[in-house]
Amino acid sequence: MKYRIKALLLASSLIITTITSVQAKEELLDRVAAIVNTGVVLESEVNDLLVNIKQQAKKNNQSLPSDKALRIQVMDKLINDSLLSQMGQRMGIQISDAQLDQTLNNMAREDKLTLAQFRQQVIDEGTSYEKYRENVRIELVSGEVSRNSVRRRIFVSPQEVDNLLKVMKEQSSNNVEYHLGHILIEFPADASQEDLAAAKTRATKVVELLNDGSDFAKIAITSSGDANALKGGDLGWKNINEMPTLFSELINDKPKDTIVGPIRTGLGYSIVKVLDIRGRKVVEVEEVKASHILIKPSIILSDEKAKSLLQGFLNQIDAGEATFEELAKEHSEGPTSVRGGDLGWADPKNYDPAFTEALATMKKGGYHKPFRSSFGWHIIKLEDRRMVDATSQLNENRAYQILFNRKYGMESTRWLKETRDEAYIEIFEQDNK
């Protein structure tokens, strides 16, 4: 009996010694490298990132600074990550598994890999995929916190955008040529006020006809007093510097099919049309003209009843008992009801995703069966589709983004420094034993 107790005590002692030894090793591996407000950076995190950076550098034949300098950079990054992670928790920012999976899928696609191949590549490089996945989540949270915090500190004025647009246009305008059509409605050299008024009335009528789709060349041949009238008013291809100043100021950066005028000159009233453009990147986007009827479910109107109600409207339209416009005015909820559900011309991408998806499957003049969006239940009538020149809007967006990015880089650094200055950060010296 004594022997058994002694054996148990000895075994217990060995277990305690082993546990103590393991704990000591764990403490050595997971020693606190830094305290960041209410969080910590562990030595194991520092070492893992150091190993990962060295592996990537070796793979890319990239030289690295000394271990000491590299460790300082790694510590800075992990401290920043900890700060931003804590801020993200306070702000309620969460990255769902679905968002994370989508990001990883995009990363794999950029490397021209399937997700399974991408995962294996991470494992082959000596990193746990689960750990890699969580690191990506941390990066996404950090990015969201940074963007939310820095964005509100940046202001880009319309004047700044206009100034940059002018510079961008000057740099590219010499390469752009416009194919112009010209109609001149003459008035006498010694024109009276009546002559001027009559010429302007004729010119205004010509512009109205052109805007309604009349043939430019035909009107030029019959009405223009310009030397090129018999050529359909064709002035040929000209860049901005080759045009009369009065024309160039009005034509510059205008899209194809733009009609400018009437413009009063010494000879009469000029009407100019941009027949075509070359040498400029033209971006066209599709717009749709649609009408809809919206029914919002409520406590007294279930989803099923809302859907059934809309299907009934479609049946009435098919039977010729009512028009879409009449039903929209009577039943649709929202501001478009007074217009018979007319949404006007718009880029379909600007609508709710479910609405955009529904429009993509429709043909001109067709109706879409009832479907659910974030606003409620809809039926749609697609009136028409068209392609429009979105170059000017694209350039404006690009100019804004350039200015925003310039300011973002500087402001992000300033904001992060302020955030670190306000935080409690204690870095512990590395134990070299």
UniProtKB/Swiss-Prot annotation:
PROSITE patterns according to UniProt: PPIC_PPIASE_1, PPIC_PPIASE_2
Documented EC number(s): 5.2.1.8
Protein location: Periplasm
Annotated keywords: Chaperone, Isomerase, Periplasm, Repeat, Rotamase, Signal
Cellular-component GO terms for this entry: outer membrane-bounded periplasmic space
GO BP annotation list: Gram-negative-bacterium-type cell outer membrane assembly; protein folding; protein stabilization
Keyword Repeat on entry: yes
Stored InterPro entries: OMP_Chaperone_SurA, PPIase_dom_sf, PPIase_PpiC, PPIase_PpiC_CS, PPIase_SurA, SurA_N, Trigger_fact/SurA_dom_sf
Pfam families: Rotamase, Rotamase_3, SurA_N
GO MF term set: peptide binding; peptidyl-prolyl cis-trans isomerase activity; unfolded protein binding
Domain PpiC: 175-276, 285-384
The protein's enzyme class: isomerase
Catalytic activity: [protein]-peptidylproline (omega=180) = [protein]-peptidylproline (omega=0)
Signal sequence annotation: 1-24
Domain notes: The PPIase activity resides only in the second parvulin domain. The N-terminal region and the C-terminal tail are necessary and sufficient for the chaperone activity of SurA. The PPIase activity is dispensable for SurA to function as a chaperone. The N-terminal region and the C-terminal tail are also required for porin recognition.
Function: Chaperone involved in the correct folding and assembly of outer membrane proteins. Recognizes specific patterns of aromatic residues and the orientation of their side chains, which are found more frequently in integral outer membrane proteins. May act in both early periplasmic and late outer membrane-associated steps of protein maturation.
NCBIfam families: PRK10770.1 (NF008038)
PANTHER family (UniProt xref): CHAPERONE SURA
Annotated protein name in UniProt: Chaperone SurA
Organism: Colwellia psychrerythraea (strain 34H / ATCC BAA-681)
